[in-house]
A protein has these predicted regions:
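Bergerat-fold GHKL ATPase/HATPase_c domain
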Residues: 1-48, 150-155
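Conserved beta-strand-loop-beta-strand hairpin that lines the nucleotide-binding pocket
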Residues: 1-12, 56-155
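Conserved ATP-binding N-box helix of the HATPase_c
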Residues: 39-65
Length: 155
């Protein structure tokens, strides 16, 4: 259980305005949420929120979004997505889940970071084509866990 007042699901992606890439990234987010112990319905909320955010991104031509964060704010009782531009400035904040869902999510989700697979020394993945091209790093007491949670290693 998470005792902190604010928890974030950080999805760090270099996003193409490409429907296939957005769809694959949404599937990867859903997979990550399930791997973190979130219910299937809530994981779909995450994926749907990403899809909505991706549509906003595609309507803002000329601006490269480098970071998409899903912020669970217990103080406000809300879950929202925040988009950040290449220069780090905030572009937009959109609702991510229904108000009733944030309590259950905040009990289950620790900080997750998504990065392109090549950021961790693997082959350069280029655009996001499938969930396999992303590596989820779940930090929990010095253990680095894979998306399925089946293998872990000490840092």
């Amino acid at each position: 259980m998470i005792s902190s007042r604010k928890t974030s699901l950080h999805i760090l992606l270099s996003l193409d305005n490409d429907a296939a890439a957005r769809s694959a990234a949404g599937a990867a987010i859903e997979f990550a949420a399930l791997g973190a112990g979130v219910t299937h319905e809530m994981s779909r909320d995450f994926a749907a929120a990403f899809s909505a955010a991706a549509r906003l991104i595609s309507h803002r031509q000329g601006e490269t979004v480098q970071r998409l964060s899903c912020v669970i704010d217990n103080r406000r009782g809300e879950v929202r997505l925040e988009l950040a531009a290449e220069d780090g400035s905030s572009l937009r904040s959109v609702p991510a889940t229904s108000p009733d869902a944030w309590k259950a999510i905040s009990r289950r989700v620790s900080v997750l970071q998504w990065k392109p697979a090549h950021a961790h020394g693997g082959k350069k993945a280029g655009r996001v084509r499938s969930p396999v091209n992303l590596l989820m790093v779940q930090k929990r007491r010095g253990v680095e866990a894979g998306a399925a949670g089946s293998r872990s290693r000490r840092k």
